[in-house]
């Protein structure tokens, strides 16, 4: 009985030692893997975010571009959509790449940011259409008025953004004058567009005190609009025009600031 007991104890001790050894080996393996991962992360960070290995990085990048170019991944076509007022040479200049250039070498975010510096461009999307095409989608600002301020003229959009000083291609746009006129021009133009005949007779809109509008009509007629809810006043003036009772009555001023009582001054 004593011999069997001694033999069992030896077997248990051997098993315990084997388990302990496996655990140690397992821990060593995990530590080794963790160490390799940390080393790899450090290497990647140094490679990407620092100047270390700069020569290797440049060499690898150059070889990748050369290889992919040989496989047909090179710039052959540029598709531009949404272009109206921005000329094509300006866009291609920002692209800064010749035909046959490695298509993967193009920095799309940089191209997009540089295009957005053009005041005509409100938004732009740039993408690669592999293997050989760059696609550019422009969303241009739409001029809605010519703003006169401090003896200068600007094209402005519905948000009041100054687009350009070149107003010559847009002689049909409404002239708005005064401080803040650019900001509120969008609302005024939107309302006037409901009455095309009246809008065609409006030569300018003057913003007064940054509060309200005076419309200068052809024939030297001045329309004083109220500060708020001027839609009814516009509707009234349009009705006069349609009834042929506006431009043949020697009107000088139509004061519509008080919606309960309109005042008319004649020449």
From Swiss-Prot:
Membrane topology (Cytoplasmic): 1-32
Residue ranges of domain POTRA in the record: 73-141
Residue stretches spanning the membrane: 33-53
Keywords carried by this UniProt record: Cell cycle, Cell division, Cell inner membrane, Cell membrane, Membrane, Transmembrane, Transmembrane helix
GO biological process, one term: FtsZ-dependent cytokinesis
GO cellular component terms, A-Z: cell division site; plasma membrane
Membrane topology: Single-pass type II membrane protein
Stretches assigned to coiled coil: none
Residue ranges, Periplasmic side: 54-267
Subcellular location: Cell inner membrane
Pfam families (alphabetical): FtsQ_DivIB_C (PF03799), POTRA_1 (PF08478)
The protein's role, per its UniProt record: Essential cell division protein.
Recorded family membership: Belongs to the FtsQ/DivIB family. FtsQ subfamily.
Protein name, entry field: Cell division protein FtsQ
Protein's organism: Rickettsia conorii (strain ATCC VR-613 / Malish 7)
Lineage: Bacteria, Pseudomonadati, Pseudomonadota, Alphaproteobacteria, Rickettsiales
């Amino acid at each position: 009985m004593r011999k069997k007991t001694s033999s069992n104890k030896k077997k248990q001790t051997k098993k315990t030692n084997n388990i302990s050894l496996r655990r140690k080996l397992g821990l060593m393996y995990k530590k080794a893997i963790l160490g390799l991962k940390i080393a790899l992360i450090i290497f990647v960070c140094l490679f990407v975010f620092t100047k270390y290995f700069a020569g290797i990085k440049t060499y690898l990048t150059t070889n990748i571009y050369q290889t992919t170019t040989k496989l047909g991944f090179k710039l052959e076509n540029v598709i531009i959509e949404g272009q109206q007022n921005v000329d094509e040479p300006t866009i291609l200049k920002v692209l800064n790449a010749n035909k046959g250039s490695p298509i993967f070498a193009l920095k799309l975010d940089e191209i997009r940011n540089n295009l957005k510096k053009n005041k005509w461009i409100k938004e732009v999307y740039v993408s690669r259409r592999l293997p050989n095409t760059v696609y550019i989608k422009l969303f241009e600002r739409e001029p809605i008025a010519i703003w006169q301020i401090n003896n200068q003229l600007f094209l402005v959009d519905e948000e009041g953004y100054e687009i350009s000083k070149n107003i010559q291609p847009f002689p049909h746009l409404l002239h708005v004058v005064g401080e803040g006129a650019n900001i509120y021009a969008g609302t005024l133009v939107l309302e006037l567009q409901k009455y095309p005949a009246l809008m065609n007779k409006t030569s300018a809109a003057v913003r007064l005190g940054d509060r309200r509008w005076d419309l200068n009509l052809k024939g030297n007629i001045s329309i004083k609009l109220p500060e708020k809810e001027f839609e009814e006043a516009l509707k009234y003036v349009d009705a006069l025009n349609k009834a042929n009772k506006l431009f043949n009555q020697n009107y000088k001023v139509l004061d519509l600031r008080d919606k309960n009582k309109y005042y008319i001054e004649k020449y």
